[in-house]
Amino acid sequence: MRNIIYFILSLLFSVTSYALETINIEHGRADPTPIAVNKFYADNSAADVLGHDMVKVISNDLKLSGLFRPISAASFIEEKTGIEYKPLFAAWRQINASLLVNGEVKKLESGKFQISFILWDTLLEKQLVGEILEVPKNLWRRAAHKIADKIYEKITGDAGYFDTKIVYVSESSSLPKIKRIALMDYDGANNKYLTNGKSLVLTPRFARSADKIFYVSYATKRRVLVYEKDLKTGKESVVGDFPGISFAPRFSPDGRKAVMSIAKNGSTHIYEIDLATKRLHKLTDGFGINTSPSYSPDGTKIVYNSDRNGVPQLYIMNSDGSDVQRISFGGGSYAAPSWSPRGDYIAFTKITKGDGGKTFNIGIMKACPQDNKNSERIITSGYLVESPCWSPNGRVIMFAKGWPSSAKAPGKNKIFAIDLTGHNEREIMTPADASDPEWSGVLN
């Protein structure tokens, strides 16, 4: 099975209780857990290079999460590597490593690599989890992400999110501006362009399976097309010609339908499209602007923003358009709601005005309408912060962040991520300006 990582053995070692308390990643801010990712044993030079690179990726994944503090290899005392021996735990405790990762890489006759790892609790001197993976060389990075995911899940109790992709809009800094749909790993690696930049493109969206995307393309000023692109084959097809559309559709959880906003006759409304028949069904009524629809994880409800009461606020309705309820009640204008994959929170952009002008904010609120009076929480603010999207485990939010032009530097737009708690804000490196991020589910 080329180009697919598969697990030979789902669990190599029995899981035992351990001294470390499970990290609560929703409430408060905990000190990062110190972890040593030891050099991976290798049976030849090719495996050694691969192992060295994998250790860097695993360490970086854990560090970026904000929940782990990888210890520098320069401080390691024990020199043994691999999974065939029991570590000298006292040596690892001496450098304050609560967790230890040992691993090995072997090149198989098939040309693939067998990668094994064990996560140890150095305090109780117990194995926590271990696995064997078999991968082709070109997927070594995904194998490293898979290992980091397993470590993250074991310690936090939540699924990891490292083996994922981000699709976004890349914009050149030179004039004329060229916008292209781009795809990269969650950490900014393996960036590649999916469109050629000949037309204006906006708001890429993943399908549930992460092997397809939607995006909006302005073929001409009057002709706006929605494309569906297969990421495995590269083939594109036109979903429809929607002159009044402003954002790409969002897929339903079952992948059979999608929702979008379309402007007609002075009003903008939410429509659902059946992807098989291409038939549209209007979900909102009345006057005003209704935009940015997003399904709940179970597909039974839709959140969107509407100015039906004068100022853009957030509303929830059933997926058939019934039982509309307002869920935002704070001052300012709300936009771009995004439902967490866990179903518990909705992320949003909020624009407020003060003496210094407009301020953009990213916030979260509970998805239950009756709980929402004064329950929203702002997690980051700036000159321009917008387009929040969720990690597949619902614990990290990615968004676009912009700065204005000045006499010293031109304006710029970049992609950032931040924890649900509002801590650990970090930039996701891209080769050019970037906006409109969308996070895939965990890859198969």
Swiss-Prot record:
Q: Which organism is it from?
A: Rickettsia rickettsii (strain Iowa)
Q: Keyword set for this entry?
A: Cell cycle, Cell division, Periplasm, Signal
| GO CC annotation | periplasmic space
Query: What is the official name of this protein in its record?
Result: Tol-Pal system protein TolB
Query: Where does the record place it?
Result: Periplasm
Q: Which Pfam families match?
A: PD40, TolB_N
Q: What does this protein do?
A: Part of the Tol-Pal system, which plays a role in outer membrane invagination during cell division and is important for maintaining outer membrane integrity.
Superkingdom per UniProt: Bacteria
